[in-house]
C-alpha cells in the first residue's frame, strides 16, 4: 500500500511538472483580419453588398489554403491556441439576427481548421451592421457572441484561468476579456470607440504585474501605423476621447511593457516604441489574401527613419494633426518594419524571448522573423 501511494505521488509530481513545462514554453498562432463572408440568405436577408466581393471570393479558395497551412504549424509544436485580431467577419448583414448568424458561422468556420481553441476580439467590422428599432445594439450582439462562443472555449482550455470580463468606456457591454495562461497575461481587447474602461484595465495590469509577458490582442494598437488612410484610428485614438485618458493609457502600456497583436490595416508590420517610461511592441498581421498579394514578400521599409512619411501624406486629418502624431511617436520608434502581405504568424514563447515568424500566404517557411524581449 505504501508503495502504491509513493508511486501515485511520484506520478502526480511528474504530471504537474509536465504541465508547468508545457505552459512555460509554447506556441501561439496569430491571425489578422479574416473578413468571413458567404453567399447565404441567413447572413444577408436583404441581399449581398457589392462593396466587398473580395471577401466571398477569398473564402472560396485562398483563405482555406492559408488556414490549413497555419494549422500545420500549430500541429508541429506545443500550440496553446489561435489568436485572431478582429474583423473576423465582414459585417453589413442588415439585421441583428443576420449579424449574429455571421459571427457564429464565421467563428465555427475558423475553428473548423484548428484542433486548438480559436480566440478572437472585436474589430470594427464585427459590430458593423444596420439595426432596426427594438433590436439589440451591435456591441450587445458581440457581447452575447463572446459569452456563447469565446468564453466557453477559454473555460475548457487546460491552463487558462479567466480573470475578468469588462466594458468599454461609455458602454455596458462586456467585450474585453482578461485571462492567464501559465506565466503570461492575455487581454482580448475591444478597441472600438472610446476603448476599454481605463480604471478596469489598470486594475487588471496592476494585479498581474508578475506576468512574464502582457499580450494584448486588439484590432488596432495604441501606436499609429504609418498609413495615409485614417492614421488616427488607433486604440484610444477616437477623436472625442479625452487626451488625458489617451496619454494615461499609453503610459500604462509602457509601464507594463505590453505586446500588442493587431490587424485592421491589411499589412504586415512591426513597431518597437521605447522611452524612459517603458516599451511597447506592436505587431500587425493580415489574412486578407487578395489577388494583388504577390507570391514573394519583402518589407518596403526596415528602418525607423522612414516612420511617419505616409502619415504626413494623409488627406483624412489635417496636416497639423498628422504632424502632431509623427512628432509624438517618431522619437520613440526604435524598430520599424512594414510591408504589403497576407499570411499568418507563429509566436514561440519561453523565458528568454518571443520568436515571431511571419509566413506569407500559405507558405511553410517564414518570410520574416522577429525576436521580442521585455527584460
Predicted regions and their residues:
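Positively charged n-region of N-terminal signal peptides that target proteins for export
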Residues: 1-6
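Bacterial N-terminal signal peptides
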Residues: 7-18
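N-terminal active-site segment of His-dependent metallophosphoesterases
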Residues: 20-97
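Active-site-proximal segments of metal-dependent phosphoesterases and phosphodiesterases across multiple
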Residues: 23, 43, 47-60, 198, ...
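Loop/turn elements at helix/coil->beta-strand transitions in domains of secreted/extracellular proteins
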Residues: 24-27, 77-82, 113-119, 181-186, ...
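Short, solvent-exposed loop/turn elements at domain surfaces
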Residues: 26, 36-42, 128, 195-198, ...
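Active-site neighborhood of phospho(di)ester-bond hydrolases with catalytic His/Asp-centered motifs
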Residues: 30-32, 82-87, 118-123, 189-190, ...
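Extended active-site neighborhood of metal-dependent phosphoesterases/phosphodiesterases
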Residues: 47-53, 93-210, 237-240, 244, ...
Amino acid at each position: 500500500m505504501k508503495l502504491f501511494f509513493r508511486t501515485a505521488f511520484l506520478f502526480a509530481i511528474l504530471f504537474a511538472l509536465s504541465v508547468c513545462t508545457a505552459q512555460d514554453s509554447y506556441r501561439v498562432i496569430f491571425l489578422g483580419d479574416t473578413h468571413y463572408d458567404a453567399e447565404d440568405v441567413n447572413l444577408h436577408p436583404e441581399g449581398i453588398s457589392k462593396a466587398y466581393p473580395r471577401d466571398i471570393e477569398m473564402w472560396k479558395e485562398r483563405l482555406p489554403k492559408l488556414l490549413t497551412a497555419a494549422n500545420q504549424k500549430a500541429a508541429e509544436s506545443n500550440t496553446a491556441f489561435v489568436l485572431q485580431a478582429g474583423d473576423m467577419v465582414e459585417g453589413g448583414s442588415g439585421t441583428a439576427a443576420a449579424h449574429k448568424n455571421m459571427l457564429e458561422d464565421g467563428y465555427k468556420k475558423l475553428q473548423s481548421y484548428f484542433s486548438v481553441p480559436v480566440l478572437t476580439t472585436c474589430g470594427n467590422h464585427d459590430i458593423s451592421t444596420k439595426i432596426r428599432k427594438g433590436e439589440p445594439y451591435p456591441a450587445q450582439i458581440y457581447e452575447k457572441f463572446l459569452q456563447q462562443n469565446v468564453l466557453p472555449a477559454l473555460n475548457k482550455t487546460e491552463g487558462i484561468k479567466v480573470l475578468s470580463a469588462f466594458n468599454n468606456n461609455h458602454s455596458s457591454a462586456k467585450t474585453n476579456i482578461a485571462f492567464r495562461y501559465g506565466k503570461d497575461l492575455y487581454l482580448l481587447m475591444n478597441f472600438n470607440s472610446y476603448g476599454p474602461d481605463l480604471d478596469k484595465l489598470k486594475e487588471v495590469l496592476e494585479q498581474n504585474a508578475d506576468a512574464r509577458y502582457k499580450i494584448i490582442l486588439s484590432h488596432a494598437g495604441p501606436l499609429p501605423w504609418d498609413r495615409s488612410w485614417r492614421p488616427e484610428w488607433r486604440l484610444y485614438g477616437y477623436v472625442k476621447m479625452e487626451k488625458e485618458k489617451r496619454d494615461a493609457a499609453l503610459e500604462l502600456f509602457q509601464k507594463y511593457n505590453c505586446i500588442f497583436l493587431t490587424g485592421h490595416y491589411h499589412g504586415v508590420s512591426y513597431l518597437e516604441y521605447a522611452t524612459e517610461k517603458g516599451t511597447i511592441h506592436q505587431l500587425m498581421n493580415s489574412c486578407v489574401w487578395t489577388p494583388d498579394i504577390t507570391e514573394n514578400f519583402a518589407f518596403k521599409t526596415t528602418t525607423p527613419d522612414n516612420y511617419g512619411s505616409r502619415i504626413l501624406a494623409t488627406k483624412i486629418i489635417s496636416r497639423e494633426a498628422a504632424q502632431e502624431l509623427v512628432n509624438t511617436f517618431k522619437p520613440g520608434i526604435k524598430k520599424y518594419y512594414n510591408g504589403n502581405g497576407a499570411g499568418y504568424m507563429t509566436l514561440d514563447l519561453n523565458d528568454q524571448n518571443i520568436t515571431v515568424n511571419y509566413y506569407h500566404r500559405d507558405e511553410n517557411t517564414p518570410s520574416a522573423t522577429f525576436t521580442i524581449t521585455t527584460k
